[in-house]
């Protein structure tokens, strides 16, 4: 059965450091997600930059604290995988928590990867993808990169449990490797070697 999109809305936000516009947009998205019913089918497109655009701090974490930790991670030299592990542990929406909020509605996720390895859990910090690992991994990463956090934030990280596995299909639309393969094919078809 063909359905029409009832409405759409574009909200600009900041990248690579989250801002208040992103926070407000994420609150609206999360509240809308929680209203989904068993009869709804949510289609979610996620691509590079979503880790900073989707920002909703975990309980006990202030937006400014999360923003500060994010900025310190950006300047630390940590890999994107490690940054996204920490971002998930500080979030109400990442690491599959958006899919959990949408349940029992159906959800299908389409992804465009810009990260090495194309791990769906790391694209946008995986808001609709079950994350692996535990939040104590975040504490280890923060310690390794000498990023200090308060006891309140440490407690919040440890209490922010990952959701149960939700069976939701996800499809990779594009990766850097796919782009390179297509560019090479196009070049060969144009007579280049």
What are these regions (language model features)?
Residues 2-6:
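Short, small-residue-biased leader/transition segments that mark boundaries at the very start
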Residues 7-20:
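A structural-propensity feature for long, helix-poor, extended segments
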Residues 7-10, 30, 34, 57-68, ...:
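A glycine- and small-aliphatic-rich helix-loop capping segment at beta-alpha/alpha-beta transitions
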Residues 18, 22-29, 39, 62-66, ...:
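Generic structural signal for well-ordered, non-membrane alpha-helical segments
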Residues 18-60, 72:
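Hydrophobic alpha-helical hairpins/lids featuring a short glycine-rich hinge
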Residues 59-84:
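Short, acidic/small-residue loops that bind anionic groups at enzyme active sites
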Residues 74, 80-147:
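A glycine/threonine-rich phosphate-anchoring loop and its flanking beta-alpha core
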Residues 105-108, 130-193:
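Accessory alpha-helical/coil subdomains and C-terminal extensions
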């Amino acid at each position: 059965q063909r359905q029409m999109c009832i409405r759409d809305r574009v909200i600009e936000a900041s990248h690579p450091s989250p801002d208040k516009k992103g926070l407000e947009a994420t609150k609206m998205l999360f509240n809308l997600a929680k209203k989904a019913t068993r009869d709804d089918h949510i289609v979610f497109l996620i691509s590079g930059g979503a880790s900073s655009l989707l920002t909703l701090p975990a309980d006990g974490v202030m937006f400014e604290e999360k923003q500060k930790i994010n900025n310190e991670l950006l300047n630390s030299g940590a890999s994107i995988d490690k940054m996204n592990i920490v971002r998930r542990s500080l979030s109400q929406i990442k690491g599959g928590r958006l899919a959990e909020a949408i349940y029992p509605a159906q959800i299908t996720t389409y992804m465009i990867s810009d990260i090495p390895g194309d791990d769906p859990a790391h694209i946008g910090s995986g808001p609709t993808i079950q994350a692996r690992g535990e939040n104590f991994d975040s504490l280890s990463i923060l310690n390794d990169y000498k990023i200090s956090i308060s006891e309140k934030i440490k407690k919040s990280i440890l209490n922010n449990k990952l959701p149960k596995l939700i069976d939701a299909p996800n499809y990779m639309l594009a990766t850097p490797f796919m782009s390179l393969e297509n560019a090479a094919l196009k070049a060969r078809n144009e007579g280049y070697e």
